[in-house]
Amino acid sequence: MTGSLQSAARSYLRGLGDESTVVLCGGTALLIVSRYQGSADFFRAVFSPKLAGHPAIDALPYFWWFGTSVIFYVVLSLALSAATRGSFTRSYGLRLGDFRAGAAIAAALLVATAAAIYIASRTHTFSNHYPLARHGAYTLRFGDKQAVSRGLFALYEAGYFLYFLAWEFLFRGWMLNGLLPRFGRGAIAIQMVPFALMHLGKPELEALGSIIAGIALGILALRTRSFWYGAFLHGALAVFMDLLVAWRYLFPHVPSP
């Protein structure tokens, strides 16, 4: 009985031993570990007590999150492919691909989506959620005093943009291209699932919209053979949302756009 079960298990496992299995299992593990050790909450629990007097103490957990995301989503994903002799020697969408089509499509989507971002930024649901660091994204603390810092905000948004480059590489670069040989265009739908689930906790409309966004960004990456255009689009829209919400604090004497 035990022998037959072992034989059946080996038979099933042999069919799972390709790169798509490494991408699905490894990608899931990377997302889980990053959610714990790479989160802002982890930084607050481990490091914040030791850095309590730092002027940017409210922003530091997010710099940790953005930085560790690059390690988990880019460095470790490629290391995993290398260790398992996957297709790490391929581009994984790292090349520019079809630049003309990518730039045109990304620009059109940027203009079309920016209007929705603008409207959303005027609602309490989104203005109370972004920036993710809230006032910490642009506020320095000096004892009992606080000061708005545009420089801190610029650094925060640069890190935030870098986070989206890593995020897009994981889903539309590494995962999509790793699944493509086995699942064909179905890989677009498969990579959308964990992408959408990672939006749990965000405003409901954004979480639901991530289903459409995940499919659209997957198509864009497949059409252009590059993840860069979706990464720029995703990052630019996220920074735009933060800027709209934080504008009145950063530029109190300048009318809000």
Please name every model-derived segment.
Residues M1-G93, L244-P257:
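N-terminal, membrane-interfacial amphipathic/helix-forming hydrophobic leader that caps
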Residues T21-C25, F63, G67, G102-A107, ...:
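Hydrophobic alpha-helical transmembrane segments
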Residues F42-F63, A83-Y163, P181, F251-P257:
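Juxtamembrane helix-loop-helix connectors linking adjacent transmembrane helices
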Residues G67-V75, A154, A158, L170, ...:
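Membrane-embedded alpha-helical segments of multi-pass membrane proteins
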Residues A166-I190, I219-S226:
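Membrane-interface helix/loop boundary segments of multi-pass membrane proteins
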Residues A189-M192, M198, E204-P257:
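Functionally important transmembrane alpha-helices
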